[in-house]
């Protein structure tokens, strides 16, 4: 099967290598000419994922060349670039391939999920792939399980057959809204978990943040049409665990730096790659206001990131809120 992967960051590189191992004909598209020259000459993508890129994987900066005759096109760019790449795809598309989206985020200007953005430009079936999946582990063939979601279950089944092997297991879920929101909103909680670590707090604090974070993710998700059970699955609890606890998580690492006293700008500069949770915090905060949903952790992280609130004061605000029942609002 010919599969195109658009975006040569960590996840795009990892999924391209994984699919090449399965015997598919892979084309990896990128737009950065310097990165293109580096990969072509060294077969390494040093900035993002410094592993050998097999010679069988074609590398190109020509989008039309990349997607021509592809049966599946994987969008593996950051969430802020999904609209641009979708618009470009509309201009070059010549067949009804399945789109697989890997980006996890909510567009800040429109508050739309990534599949909604893609569908503005393409009539193709869109399959969302989400779950606990560090690229660094997938590329090393460490056992990983994720979830696929689409309005067309048949499209999910085609992707499931094409992507699965003994080290990469995929489940199907019909709840596109929940799967996308779980994958996006957990990055906010991971920033909070990192801030907690940076402040020197312990496991109790992180466990509380993760659990109460899941509660507010679920509240917003249900208000937007999700099945609450989705957030107990791989796109919810699964992704939340790995992103809040692993040092491979950019969101957690950025949070640690902020907890240690660095500004948001300094933290992002030190990470050197996209930290999706920052923009998602803006989007989720606005969604919570529009839908009148209580999201106290998101509110405090927003205040830390964009209003200069001291993290210790944010913790105090959370710990001294009015008394609640645990399942309030769910």
From Swiss-Prot:
Its EC number is 1.1.1.94. Its main location: cytoplasm. Keywords: Cytoplasm, Lipid biosynthesis, Lipid metabolism, NAD, NADP, Nucleotide-binding, Oxidoreductase, Phospholipid biosynthesis, Phospholipid metabolism. Pathway: Membrane lipid metabolism; glycerophospholipid metabolism. The keyword Lipid metabolism applies. NADPH binds at residues 10-11, 31, 104, 135, 250, 274, 276. GO terms for biological process: carbohydrate metabolic process; glycerol-3-phosphate biosynthetic process; glycerol-3-phosphate catabolic process; glycerophospholipid metabolic process; phospholipid biosynthetic process. Sn-glycerol 3-phosphate binds at residues 104, 131, 133, 186, 239, 249-251. HAMAP family: NAD_Glyc3P_dehydrog. Belongs to the NAD-dependent glycerol-3-phosphate dehydrogenase family. Catalyzes the reduction of the glycolytic intermediate dihydroxyacetone phosphate (DHAP) to sn-glycerol 3-phosphate (G3P), the key precursor for phospholipid synthesis. This is Glycerol-3-phosphate dehydrogenase [NAD(P)+]. It comes from Thermoanaerobacter pseudethanolicus (strain ATCC 33223 / 39E). The gene is gpsA.
């Amino acid at each position: 099967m010919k599969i195109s992967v658009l975006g040569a960051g960590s996840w795009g590189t990892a999924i391209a290598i994984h699919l090449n191992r399965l015997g598919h004909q892979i084309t990896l598209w990128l737009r950065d000419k310097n990165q293109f020259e580096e990969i072509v000459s060294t077969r390494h993508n040093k900035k993002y994922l410094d592993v050998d890129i097999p010679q069988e994987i074609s590398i190109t900066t020509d989008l039309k060349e990349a997607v021509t005759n592809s049966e599946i096109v994987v969008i593996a760019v950051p969430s802020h670039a999904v609209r641009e790449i979708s618009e470009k795809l509309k201009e070059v598309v010549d067949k009804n391939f399945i789109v697989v989206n890997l980006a996890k985020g909510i567009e800040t200007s429109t508050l739309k999920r990534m599949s909604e953005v893609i569908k503005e430009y393409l009539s193709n079936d869109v399959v969302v792939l989400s779950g606990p999946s560090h690229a660094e582990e997938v590329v090393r063939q460490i056992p990983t399980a994720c979830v696929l979601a689409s309005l067309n279950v048949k499209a999910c089944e085609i992707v499931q057959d094409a992507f699965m092997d003994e080290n990469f297991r995929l489940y199907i879920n019909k709840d596109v809204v929940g799967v996308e929101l779980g994958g996006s909103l957990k990055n906010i909680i991971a920033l909070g978990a990192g801030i907690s670590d940076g402040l020197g707090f312990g496991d109790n604090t992180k466990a509380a943040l993760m659990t109460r974070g899941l509660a507010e993710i679920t509240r917003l998700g249900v208000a937007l049409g999700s099945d609450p059970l989705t957030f107990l699955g791989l796109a919810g609890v699964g992704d939340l665990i790995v992103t809040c606890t692993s040092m491979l998580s950019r969101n957690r690492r950025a949070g640690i730096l902020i907890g240690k006293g660095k500004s948001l700008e300094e933290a992002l500069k030190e990470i050197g790659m996209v930290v999706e949770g920052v923009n998602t915090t803006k989007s989720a905060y606005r969604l919570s206001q529009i839908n009148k949903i209580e999201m106290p952790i998101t509110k405090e992280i927003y205040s830390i990131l964009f209003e200069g609130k001291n993290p210790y004061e944010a913790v105090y605000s959370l710990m001294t809120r009015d008394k609640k029942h645990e399942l309030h609002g769910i």
